[in-house]
Amino acid sequence: LPPLLAAVGFALTLALFYLGLMDYDARHVYLDAQRGFYGDWQSPVMTLLWKLIDPLAPGPASMFLLIAALYWLGFALLAATLARRSLALACAVPLVALTPPLFVLVGVIWRDVLMAACWMVAMALVYAFHARERWLTAARIIALLLIVFGVLIRPNAIAAAPLLIGYALWPASFSWKRTLALVVPAMLVLVVTVRLVYYGALHAN
């Protein structure tokens, strides 16, 4: 039932917000994607992503669909995991996703929303498999990639990333002490990663 409610939420998102809302910044990124120009005023990684997915649904629709799918996937994973403990609590999760402070942003094509959706999936994935050792390593790897991707989308959110990395590494025994020890090295690695990807791989201007 909870995943079904999430699917209904996704359908409602499409009905209300399709094709998505583009502001000036998003339009700028989309036009750069069409030209194959990677500037660092916005995220060149988002520009590349949009260029890759645009043939699936040209225009704002491709990015809107990706954001909406990630948003509802994250809540569906969380709901399905909580259903093992409480069906009522699990059913409440998709309803939380529909509350105005969250839901009204799903249709807005902002890199902040894309980053948040990626991080939501990352945390929900690790939480879903934290007690399943067989799948936990794969869940960790995917989560860490999503966290790094979120930083590449929104570099000034880098300070929040070590907390998420800490949970991804130690979901069953999260420790503030270990996570705080991770802050400086994680941020240094992420700063270097951003520079290597932006200016080394994509030659952003």
Give residue ranges: language-model regions.
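Multi-pass, polyprenyl lipid-linked donor-dependent membrane glycosyltransferases
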Residues: Y24-R27, M63-L70, P94-V126, F149-A160
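Extracytoplasmic catalytic/substrate-binding loops of multi-pass membrane glycan-assembly enzymes
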Residues: L16-V29, F37-L49, I53, P58-A61
